[in-house]
């Protein structure tokens, strides 16, 4: 398959928006010539889905997707793995791409951080990127001619009674996952993770680029002169509160 044929088929099928570009994180311009393509095989954001679990057994289909995607750039296709864990065979045994092991806490899984350290963008440069599940979707299009935007998502957060993985489709109503599954109290429901997701209502839909639904307590209660208190029940990364004396303690964090 040539680059022109791949682009034409992706545009005709409606799957082209799966491919985004940096800078700016917008849908890629099919007329551009990207210097490289990035795929982050892991998400380091809080409670994010574990791609190593999701991709168990999808080795051949994922490789087909990589072969197709690699035709879109004359540069390298970077597949970035979590160096702190053992990656799924679909990732660690991938061929025809440059495999990079990334170490460290969040935001190590952020595509912008990875681009900055591996292939920095200069003036006039464009880099395309997509997610591992996007690669599978594109592979299915060319293998079976299917427009298949099914995906595996994680429903997470301390307000969720039964956190688990679900197979669903892009844009589905989140009611299917949170009905009778929320703890008591006012909840902040997020399409995506708590750091970069979007606030949504109970009858809204899952974002097109999201693989996670998060529900945490809404921080709608204030504490009088709370800044004066020792803060044994408040998490602090910088040791502002005395909670640092109990480093193993777990916190139920809200929007405050």
Where is each model-derived feature located?
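Buried, small/hydrophobic-residue-enriched core segments of structured protein domains
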Residues: 1-256
């Amino acid at each position: 398959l040539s680059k022109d044929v791949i682009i034409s088929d992706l545009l005709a099928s409606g799957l082209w928006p799966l491919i985004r570009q940096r800078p700016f994180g917008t849908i890629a311009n099919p007329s551009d010539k990207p210097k490289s393509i990035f795929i982050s095989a892991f998400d380091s954001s809080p409670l994010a889905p574990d791609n190593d679990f999701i991709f168990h057994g999808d080795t051949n289909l994922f490789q087909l997707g990589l072969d197709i995607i690699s035709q879109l750039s004359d540069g390298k296709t970077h597949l970035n793995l979590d160096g702190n864990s053992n990656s799924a065979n679909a990732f660690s045994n991938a061929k025809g791409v440059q495999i990079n092991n990334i170490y460290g806490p969040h935001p190590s899984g952020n595509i912008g951080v990875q681009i900055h350290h591996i292939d920095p963008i200069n003036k006039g440069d464009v880099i395309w990127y997509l997610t591992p599940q996007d690669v599978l979707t594109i592979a299915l299009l060319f293998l079976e001619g299917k427009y298949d935007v099914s995906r595996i998502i994680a429903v997470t957060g301390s307000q969720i009674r039964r956190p688990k993985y679900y197979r669903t489709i892009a844009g589905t109503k989140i009611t299917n996952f949170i009905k009778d599954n929320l703890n008591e109290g006012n909840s902040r429901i997020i399409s995506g993770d708590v750091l970069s997701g979007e606030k949504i209502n109970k009858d809204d839909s899952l974002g097109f680029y999201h693989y996670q639904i998060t529900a945490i307590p809404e921080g709608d209660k204030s504490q009088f002169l709370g800044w004066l208190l020792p803060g044994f029940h408040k998490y602090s990364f910088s040791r502002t509160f005395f909670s640092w004396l109990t480093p193993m303690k777990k916190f139920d964090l809200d929007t405050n």
